[in-house]
Design a protein with these regions (language model features):
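Short intrinsically disordered terminal tails
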Residues: 1, 100-107
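Short N-terminal "domain-start" leader segments
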Residues: 1-62
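Short, ordered coil/turn segments that flank beta-strands lining enzyme active or ligand-binding pockets
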Residues: 11, 70, 86
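Short, exposed beta-strand "edge-strand" segments with a Pro/Gly-rich flavor and a Y/T-containing core
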Residues: 11-16, 77-83
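Acidic, low-complexity intrinsically disordered regions
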Residues: 17, 43, 94, 100-103
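Short aromatic-glycine-(Arg/Gly/Cys) micro-motifs in beta-strand/loop hairpins
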Residues: 48-78, 94, 101
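A short, charged, amphipathic alpha-helix used as a generic interaction element across diverse proteins
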Residues: 83-101
Length: 107
């Protein structure tokens, strides 16, 4: 099995080259779609722009929501990935609900 070439995507999921990806990647403010602090937890949703789906038949997963426990040096306690900005925004809101209800531990 060979290595798959890295695939880059813009905010709308359209393929782009690495130069365009670097342009979109910095500064972080333009790729961060959600950031909330809830008690000792931080919920963050960002555009990655790289396909993190390791299933060759699946959709590119280019957005990510993570929950961090800031009382433990920002240790991540949950991670979900999405194909679209809409899924990521909805997932961010769902993660906020999970943290508020302390359901994040069941990811």
């Amino acid at each position: 099995m060979g290595w798959k070439q890295v695939s880059y995507y813009d905010f709308d999921g359209k393929p782009i080259d690495s130069d365009k990806w670097q342009e979109l990647y910095y500064p972080i403010e333009q790729r961060q779609f959600g950031r909330n602090k809830i008690g000792k937890f931080r919920v963050s949703t960002v555009w990655l722009g790289l396909n993190y789906n390791f299933n060759p038949n699946g959709k590119p997963l280019i957005f990510e929501t993570m929950i961090f426990d800031e009382s433990k040096n920002s240790e991540d306690v949950g991670c979900l990935r999405y194909s679209t900005k809409e899924e990521a925004l909805a997932g961010h809101q769902e993660a906020i609900k999970w943290v508020r209800k302390r359901r994040w531990m069941f990811w």
